[in-house]
């Protein structure tokens, strides 16, 4: 098992892709801590992990709060005795894209704070523990929205997810000498939770248009999203850092 004896922390781990990643880590031997801002999601996520026989703990944490993040990370690292993997999957958008004049400063702050600052706070809290352990792996979450000019992503989200790429590369350079690797994943549209409902509500024409924008002409399975994250987090990618892995069916090539 790729993560036997490893301790992993997953933000946004209460549901959707974050929970699926936590389950993947756990099934391959990791003890897992999930952080999520939604108390019900943390409770449900822990129940799911425990039912699968995975050693797990959870905390209700808003990643925009650096003190809360640090306290939760320190607690998880202390409980496991070390911390080896961070999956910074927490993020968010304004939902339906808005024109520039309809985006308030508060709207912009919300998206930047959750995505960029949240990722920064989590990395800042985890790196000291990884240094103490002699190394580690961090996987950040960009998006097709940070890699293309897709009109469905919105300006704040596109800016935030592009910023994640810069954060990833610069952090990778800084912590590389400590044996810590930092890589980004850039998923496209994957159908879990809210996104599944949005896709199902589209007309047949609109769904076909979405699929036509993807060179592979189909949506991914949840496993096709989880497996690349596990690859980047594992020693299978031990000589890869500062990279971005597109998991969007080639959609990033469309511009």
Labelled PLM ranges:
Residues 2-33, 171:
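Canonical Rossmann dinucleotide-binding motif of NAD(H)/NADP(H)-dependent dehydrogenases/reductases
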Residues 39-40, 60-72, 105, 223-224:
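The beta1-alpha1 cofactor-binding region of Rossmann-like NAD(H)/NADP(H)-dependent oxidoreductases
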Residues 97, 230, 241-255:
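Short C-terminal tail/terminal secondary-structure segment
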Residues 97-100, 104-112, 206, 210:
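Substrate-binding pocket helix/loop in short-chain dehydrogenase/reductase
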Residues 123, 160, 168:
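Active-site helix of classical SDR
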Residues 128, 173-177, 238:
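Alpha-helical segment proximal to the catalytic Tyr-Lys
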Residues 143:
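Residue(s) in the substrate-gating loop at a strand-loop-helix junction
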């Amino acid at each position: 098992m790729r993560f036997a004896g490893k301790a992993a922390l997953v933000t946004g781990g209460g549901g959707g892709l974050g929970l699926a990643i936590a389950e993947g880590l756990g099934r391959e031997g990791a003890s897992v801590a999930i952080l999520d801002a939604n108390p019900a999601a943390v409770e449900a996520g822990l129940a799911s992990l425990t039912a699968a026989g995975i050693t797990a703990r959870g905390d209700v944490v808003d990643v925009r709060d650096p003190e809360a993040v640090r306290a939760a990370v320190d607690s998880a690292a202390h409980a496991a005795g070390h911390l080896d993997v961070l999956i910074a999957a927490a993020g968010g958008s304004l939902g339906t894209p808005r024109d520039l004049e309809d985006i308030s400063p508060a709207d912009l702050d919300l998206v930047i704070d959750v995505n960029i600052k949240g990722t920064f706070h989590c990395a800042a809290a985890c790196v000291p523990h990884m240094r103490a352990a002699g190394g580690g792996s961090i996987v950040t979450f960009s998006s097709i929205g940070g890699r293309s000019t897709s009109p469905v992503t919105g300006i704040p989200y596109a800016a935030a997810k592009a910023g994640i790429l810069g954060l990833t590369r610069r952090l990778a350079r800084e912590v590389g000498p400590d044996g810590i690797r930092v890589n980004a994943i850039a998923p496209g549209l994957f159908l879990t939770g809210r996104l599944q409902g949005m896709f199902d509500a589209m007309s047949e024409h609109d769904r076909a248009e979405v699929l036509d924008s993807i060179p592979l002409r189909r949506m991914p399975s949840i496993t096709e999203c989880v497996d690349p994250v596990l690859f980047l987090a594992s020693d299978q990618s031990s000589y890869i850092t500062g990279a971005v892995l597109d998991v969007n069916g080639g959609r990033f090539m469309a511009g």
